Amino acid sequence: VRNFGFGDLIFRTPKGKELITVSNLPELINAIQTVPEGSLLYHAKSNHFSNWLAAHGYLGLASQVRPLNHADFKNSTAHRAYLVELIENTIKNRKARQVVEIQRDTFDHTKRFTQISGGSLGGKARGLAFAQKMIRLSDFRDRYDGIEINIPHAVVIGTDSFDEFMKQNNLWSDALSKKTNKQISKLFLNSNINEELKNSLKVFVKSVKYPLAVRSSSLLEDSQYQPLSGMYATYMLPNNRKKLKERLEDIIVAIKLVYASTFFQDPKSLISGSVHHIEEEKMAVIIMQMVGQNYNGRYYPPISGTAQSFNFYPVSYMKRNEGVVHLALGLGRTIANGEKSLRFSPKYPGILPQYYSIKAALESSQNSFYAMDLSPKNHPLFNGEEKNLSSYNLEIAETDGSLKWSGSIISKEDNVIRDSLSYDGTRITTFAPILKWGKFPLVDILKDLIIMGKEALGCEVEIEFAVNIFDDPNRKPEFALLQIKPMVMGGSREIINIEEESNNEIFCSSKVTLGDGLIDNVRHIVFVDP
């Protein structure tokens, strides 16, 4: 019965002397790392590890450990390391299964999603938690073995803290009556968060050294009907000041400003035109690891983007239900602000309609990108949300080494687009190494995520993502799913067919147009024949 795995696992010498008792996975890791080689071989050959794991419900791990043979490894050190890696991956995956609350004294880096305070997670954080669960419950990651696919580490401050902040500082009346965003921001910055939240944030800040994005996650944000996506504030923080007190203060200021954005004029106007009331809105806050790399004091990912399952503006033989992707070099603000980015159908990644001529390529290509300035002299919150990031030209990206994943050149010699940076000419972004040469399976990943998202949500979906590709060949490239949310679908979905026979009735036509829609306040159209 002892060898069936019930109860504790007792490590012994081959002669039966007890060495150490194990009751959970962390203790098992410690034992594997410390017991003598003879004991390790004895238990491995006798299948005691897999028996104990299976009896304690770790069936997947047991099935991985069972077929292992010591002869398959170079030495016992390699054997130990492999066993530890398998167990650590199981611990990490189990902890990633749920949103857990932060502990008072420690922050666990193996947990992808942690909550501070109670209440709702808000729309954006709820979508992030859903994305994590969707990835975990599928075999999605197994299809891309050499790529790290996950959501960024995130801490969510539930809406209970927002309620307490508003009540403790008696803010409701003033927040609703102030006329300008500047007045509202000042009101909130002069208010205090409670000590319990401050202490939890202090535990978090002590443990993380990477740049952070402090994002809104209101109740109405990213909902399928009348969403407020993009209406509230997001602040990027280098999180690299020398003093803990300063880093903590930056996060607290960013949280207050996100809270304040609940009452800014744009969201208030949008809510007033809906079935909702501003008094119903509550704000959760996500503090998320920024995805990117440090390029000479600038922090940004080589690729960021969005993917939508429905294409409102198909051209040529593209179809609406084939979706559309927008890609940009650097942080995603380029796309969020509607600036120049690369647009293509995931079904035809090699076809770029916006580059139908050299002139069009020059006019349509992204020519600048956003990054976080990591300089200690830069105060990330001093000039508000819009000045929170810095803009750079493509020559800087080439110097950084990040343009090689997205850049091409319009050759000065023959005025032809070359998928190489070794020619003289104008730099443009085509993402040819990804879309044409398959250096990273981005299109396949996005296709799979769109299918999974539509099945899970039961509607058209929009995905936000970022990609890290490293120069170090031993480091896995990363695909970070930043958000998945219902896509806003308004107006008619009816397909309008124009027959060839009706060409003589067409008074104006174009090969590059917006999709159809409805404008109900236009009564007359005046056409002037050019």
Q: Which residue stretches match the model-derived regions?
A:
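Short hydrophobic alpha-helical segments that form membrane-spanning helices or hydrophobic packing faces
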Residues: 62-68, 130, 160-162, 236-238
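Conserved, mostly hydrophobic/aromatic
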Residues: 154
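Short runs of predominantly hydrophobic/aromatic residues within well-ordered alpha helices
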Residues: 25, 45-49, 61-62, 124, ...
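Terminal, compositionally biased segments used for targeting/anchoring and flexible tails
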Residues: 1-96
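An N-terminal structural lobe/cap that precedes and organizes the functional/catalytic core
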Residues: 141-151
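N-terminal leader/propeptide and maturation segments of large enzyme subunits in energy/redox metabolism
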Residues: 171, 175-189
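Short active-site loop/helix that positions an aromatic residue
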Residues: 131-136, 162-168
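Conserved mixed alpha/beta core segments that line enzyme active sites in large multi-domain catalysts
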Residues: 102-143, 192-530
